[in-house]
């Protein structure tokens, strides 16, 4: 009884809240065998085809490349891209890519040479002989990203699940209308699907492996059952058709009954999920050494005369594929990449196929119906009932329109899987998913700006802290240099301290200097006075020389005689002043020899006399100059000036020698 209950638990299927049942529209492409698209005249390979940064280029324009040769460097979360065929790189330039914005991205343009020559390949016949890190590196260097639409780097996802994965789920639901790429892949390549699952089991070592597939794919179910015959370690679970049962969180709930918490991934509850197309790409990369250079693309819609699924090389222009399926342009033209609910209208038909391009929908004018204008929300609540993520689409709509970013974030906007179920049931024709996508982009932009501001603030604070540390270090070095003394400096300081100590010890005693023991400065004083007298004599000689030069220009003999007399008087006074200074110095020295007090008095008298002599000399010079000016005017005035000069000179001499 317990075993029967356990078996029933293993086969149990749960359900998720919400969801819709739109028309499937799959038969027009699922019943047609897959075709291989020929090589176009030009391949355009975008450098970024995954969720993450683009890789660094390894090639240049004009270079010949081989099929499978890497065009960019794969490092970290950067997934490399490869040449889909052999040929020449004609350009590396921006080109419009498969994105709703229609912005141009950097692409490698390759002109095929028609030979389709492979690079050297190294197949691994037995992958079990390789360690896990080698397998992960092989998958990463093959450029594999999630082919289900998200484009997450597969190797990074697998590496994060090496420990703690309980359940491995293979997503074969393919729930969106019109898309049948995985359906035809399972019908025609079921063995490769199972081999890829075994590789993942070897890597992850999960406790159970589940394949989830909707019940509207009977041919694919039968093909998988044939490939699984005799294998009990992989369980095929057929689930009811309901959109969006192919979502990661929704399929996890259906197969395990576990709900992924808000803001987290399925790996947080021990579940890892891979798409069927990704599993086949892993098998070809590990065993056959084939990088991801092609994928299955569904071409469908009433605007095509021969819809179906094609093996298309990465970089093939969309218009080229549409022509292979018998494209009949509509008015106005409309081509959608992806399904009718989660896809977007292409801005141009020259955009290339990328790794996440699973469907090209070309509807007829009557197929999509008339576009009705957007109306006001009537708060009917149908969007809430249809939301498979358990969100409040109506509130998120108001927050998005009102730019209330924090409220939108707090209401788990980023848990929205953009399935379009809310917009599908909205009676007001409000494009809710477009509002959510725009709001997510604005929040991401604000987060990036905040992160840049935080980084700038951190750099500024780090710089200020560094400058403060350097300042403290400089001050400390200066203090250490000021405190640190050499041996010689220390000896000098010690000697000065000892002298001060000795002086302080005798500072209270009275100093009595007997007569005759005073410092004898008489010689120094006499020498100084002699130098002053010599300087005055030299000045007098210079003035005499100038006077002589001036007298040579005088034409009148009387003026010459007066000038000569004045010069003689100046010379005589200078000599007398020198003799007086010398006598005073000698007298002072004799007096100092007798008594220090007398020496001081004599020195003071000598200074006074020297000062008077200098004043007399200046007076004589002024008189002489005045006389020379007067001589130039009148001889009588010259005679009077000479007499006055003689009187003043006599008085000055008497003042110097009163005795």
From Swiss-Prot:
Gene Ontology biological process: electron transport chain
Cellular location(s): Cell inner membrane
Principal location class: membrane
EC number: 7.-.-.-
SUPFAM superfamilies, per the entry: alpha-helical ferredoxin, Nqo1 FMN-binding domain-like
Keyword Iron-sulfur among record annotations: yes
Lipid bilayer topology: Peripheral membrane protein
Taxonomic superkingdom: Bacteria
InterPro entries according to UniProt: 4Fe4S_Fe-S-bd (IPR017896), 4Fe4S_Fe_S_CS (IPR017900), Ion_transpt_RnfC/RsxC (IPR010208), Nuo51_FMN-bd (IPR011538), Nuo51_FMN-bd_sf (IPR037225), RnfC_N (IPR026902), Soluble_ligand-bd (IPR019554)
PROSITE patterns in the record: 4FE4S_FER_1, 4FE4S_FER_2
GO cellular component: plasma membrane
Transmembrane segments: none
All copies of domain 4Fe-4S ferredoxin-type, residue ranges: 366-397, 407-436
Cofactors required: [4Fe-4S] cluster
Sequence positions that bind [4Fe-4S] cluster 2: 387, 416, 419, 422
Keyword hit for Disulfide bond: no
Cofactor comment: Binds 2 [4Fe-4S] clusters per subunit.
GO molecular function, one term: metal ion binding
Keywords in alphabetical order: 4Fe-4S, Cell inner membrane, Cell membrane, Electron transport, Iron, Iron-sulfur, Membrane, Metal-binding, Repeat, Translocase, Transport
Residues that hold [4Fe-4S] cluster 1 according to the record: 377, 380, 383, 426
Free-text function comment from the UniProt entry: Part of a membrane-bound complex that couples electron transfer with translocation of ions across the membrane.
Assembly notes: The complex is composed of six subunits: RnfA, RnfB, RnfC, RnfD, RnfE and RnfG.
Family, per entry: Belongs to the 4Fe4S bacterial-type ferredoxin family. RnfC subfamily.
Protein name: Ion-translocating oxidoreductase complex subunit C
Lineage of the organism: Bacteria, Pseudomonadati, Pseudomonadota, Gammaproteobacteria, Enterobacterales
